[in-house]
Each structure stands twice: as C-alpha cells, then as structure tokens.
Curated annotation (Swiss-Prot):
It holds the Pfam family Cyclin_N. Belongs to the cyclin family. Essential for the control of the cell cycle at the G1/S (start) transition. Interacts with the CDC28 protein kinase to form MPF. This is G1/S-specific cyclin CLN2. It comes from Candida albicans. One of its GO terms (molecular function) is cyclin-dependent protein serine/threonine kinase regulator activity. One of its GO terms (biological process) is filamentous growth. The gene is CLN2.
Amino acid sequence: MFPNSPDAFHQVRMMQSSIKASNFKLQSMEFRCHSNNVCEYQMEMLHHLLSVEAKTLPSLSLIEQQPEIKLGMRPLLLDFLMEVITILNLSRSTFPLTVNLIDRYCSTRIVKKQHYQLLGLTSLWISCKNLDSKFKVPTLNDLRKICVDSYYKELFVEMEKHILKSLEWVVNAPTFDAFIDLYSNLLISNSSNFEVANIIKKSSHKIKLFSNYIGELFQFYPNIYYDYTSSQIALIAILITVLTLKIPVDLISLLNFYNGLVKTEMFKSNVEQGAEDQFEEILSVDSFKSLFNKSFFKNLIKIIDNPPSSLKIKYFAENGKYSVLMKQLVTTASNTLKCILDPVPTTPKANSFVKHQQQQHHYHPRPPMSINTSMIPLTPVSNSTSPNRFSPDQIFSENESTPGIAFGTMTPDSQSTSPGEKRSYECIDELEIGTSTIAGYTLKNHDTLKRSKSANYGTLFYLQQ
C-alpha cells in the first residue's frame, strides 16, 4: 500500500475512530457538546423538517389505484427489507426512508408485481448511500445475492435511474425517528417546566427506544402510516410510550406543549412572508382523543405483542443489544393497556386504603381520559406475493448462489378494499403478520428464471407519463 494512497488515509481514519470509540469519557464530552450546540437550532430544525415533510408525502389514493400492487403485499416486502437492514447492521433511519421512497414512487409510477422486490431493494440501496457509512453500502453483487439471483445487476442501476427521475431527485425526507429525537430534546431542554424535563431526561433512553419500536410497527399498517405524517406518528409514539410505561406526565399537557411550539415567535421567525408552510399545530387534541380509544388500545396490544418476524430478530434476539430491556418494556406496556381496557375491581376497603396512601404522599391522580368507542384503522397482512428470503451466509460470499425464487411468481390476489375506502381493525383477527409463509414460493423450473432475465431492459418498466 502506497503511503499517500486513499486507502492509507482511510486506514488512519478508521484507527483514530476506533481509539475515540473506546474512550467513554471523550464520547460523553463530545455528546454533551453536540447537544448544547443543537439546542440553539432546535426551532430551525423543527421548521425545516415540517416544511420538507409536507413536500415528500405519498398519496394513498394513487397507490390504491396500482393495477398489480396491493396494500396487502406491502407488509411482506417491508418485513423482508427490515431483515436485510438488520443483517447488514444499517442505521435506524434507513428503514423509514426506504419505505418513503417506495411509497412515493408507487404514487407516481405503475409498478408490476414482479418488480416490487426490485423497487424495494433499489430504494434500500439509495437510502444506504444517503445515510450509512460507505463500507456498509451493499454492492450490486450483494443485492443480486440478497434477491437470490432474481434480477441482473444492470436492473438495479436501471431502477435507480427511474426512481431518482420520478422523484425529481428529492431523496431525503424527514423520518419519524428524526422527529422522536427532536421532540425528546425539545422537552428535555424545556425551561418552563423543569420537573417534567427532569422526568423525561431520566427515562429518555426508554422513551426513544420504545417510541422507535412503535413507529417501526406502524410502518407495516397502511391505515396508520397513511393517515398520519411522520411528525404525527412520532408524537403518537411518544404519547403511547409515556402512557404505557407509566411516566407521570399528563398527555394533554404534553400534546399542548408540542402544538405550542409552532405558535411561538421563535418558530414563526423562520417562516418567510407569503410562504405556504404555515403550521397551526402538529396533532390536534380532537385527533388525539379520537385515536386513543378502546378499539385502538385493544389492537395496539396485538401489534406490540405480535411484531413481524424481522422486528423480533432486531429487538428480541437472545443475544441482542436491547432484548432484555425491550421484553420488559413490552410486558409493561401490554399490562398497562390491559388495565386501561379492563380495570381491576377493588373493594371499598381497598379503595379507602389507596385513598389514605395518596393523601399521605400528596398524590394527585391524573384525570381519567375520555374513551370514545369510534374507530380508527389498521390493515393486516394478507397472503399475497412475497419477497424472496435469503440466508446471511449468501451475502459477501465468493460462491455463486443458486437461483431459487422469482419475485414475480403468481399467487392469489391480496385482500384489499376499494380505493378510498377505510379499512377497520376487525379484520386483524383473521390474518396476522407472523402467519405469512415467505419461503414457500418457488419456481417450477429454472427455465422460468432464465426467461425472466432475458427480457428486454428497455420495456421492463411501464412509465406512465
């Protein structure tokens, strides 16, 4: 290796970063310095994220008009992509950005069923290039092996061009995890209420971890994901976390605090005169009350207790980084939600004892939240065309993998409602995420795969002008 070659400089940088990473005191000092600097620009960051978010929203009505792609196919593709992200150890923001790219492309172009996995992996590839370290970005050979030789390498490059042109090269979009970090920092640095700020600061790690888990779960359910923006999903996830983990903070006060941020003079000073990005509130109190009802809590228990297989691998693996903590948080959240739905009956003697204890400790109970039994929305997974599974041993290996699965295999159409029609929670009992078998779709013979690869690249994508 030459002393002045780029590889030599890269090795020096890697060695220095490893030395810094092993110094906990240095890391703590850098984090405190970073936090102090970020606090000065939090309002500018909030305004920027909300402005960009309004311009990068997908359209549910257009996605539902896809002739071959059904909403029931979407969770299966996302489950496959999340597993890829976990195995490759990519950043947390890669998954929501990938989902945003997929949905925005499906809002502008017609996608054939056999190209849905190609779209997902190419969107993941684009997200990696924007958010992850260079050495973590998968190569074209890696992508080909991940999809078990279903597509040629040239197809990924071709699909990348189509995505970038269709989205007019607007790749970056605010993700819910960015809003969760910003919301937490805004609350911790809140100078008007030091008591709440200290409570949130003590539990900030648990709040961020569980809020991100809930946000990732919501990505798999179109009726939650499309009914709310990333900023609202992040706020809903934080409110659910505060409620289920029994953090002593009033939810309505917390909601009013975040809605009040967009009305402050510091926030409005970032808005140009005559600009269209005028924000009244992030999530209205009426929307909050209509969402947090018995039906939502009942299905939230099912969602939290039965995550997709990819999230089980990410959060609940035996030797996982957060497996013990996540199991505790999920157990606490489930028990809290069950208590909200079915309160434990108490005797008059027990009630008088509790009241006596509350008076001794000057405890002021939170006023009960009104429960509205009307509706809101989740679409469960249906059995439809599923992405190809892969083995981690196939990635970064020298041996060529054997073609085994093609994404375009014909399967029964997924269950979906007509465009624009609301889906309900009731159908979640019939189909659950964990019951989808993905490894069962195989080619009848190798000639089918050869014919799919010998197609003309110029006619692969039906681009509607």
